[in-house]
From Swiss-Prot:
GO terms for molecular function: zinc ion binding. The keyword Electron transport does not apply. It comes from Orgyia pseudotsugata multicapsid polyhedrosis virus. Keywords: Early protein, Metal-binding, Zinc, Zinc-finger. It comes from the Viruses. A zinc finger (RING-type) spans 195-240. The keyword Zinc applies. This is Immediate-early protein IE-0.
Amino acid sequence: MIKGTHWPNLVSKSYTDACETSKVMDFNFIFAHMYCADMSTDGKLQAGVRAAAFGLVDDKHFELYKRRIENALFRYRDQCDGNAAPPARLSDNGDCCHHFVRDAARVVESIKSVEATSVGINVIVLLPYLKQLQIALKMLSDAFACCAKTIGGLQMYVQDLLSHCLLYADRVEAAGRALQVMNLFLNSGGPLYECDLCKEASADPRFLKPKECCQYSLCYACCVALWKTASTHAKCPACSTSFKS
């Protein structure tokens, strides 16, 4: 066992947590091929990846029932599309919606089939849709007391799977933190972009505002602060050139 001032106690809780994290790192993620360098800043791309997870459920629904998930209440609505909020009511025209219970049961059966074929961490892709489905089932529960047993069973399954996904989510976040530390060793010689005003630095070249006048480096946060305090136009702190609006 290695102990000392530079190496962690291998039986410590942090080491145990690290072992759990390593289990998350060693996987073949189902959507790894959808990676793009702009993923962290491209909302449309992010929505497309999350929608691909719903596509797995929709495809399974078609395989089982020879039809897509057509009920709007159970279609995936992404937060980046501006229509993530669930419908205010089951029907806008007063039509009977009792068949929604059957539709929900079919959706849940499709999810069960997807879950059965999902290896390890891959089940986490269902998390956004499960949160949405949980709200939809609550609406059905409030509307149809006569189907309380059926709807209650669907809610129980969704809640259990949601809890399972959230457990993996915690591990993924821990893995993300570990990877950030590991990347320090891979990119130890990479450039740092430092703001000459606030002295903050980042490895992301987008941290700094493009230079328009002199060689003075300014981050976007400082640029915004200068605009807020300027009477007319913000000016470069070094050469006093007015920035473009």
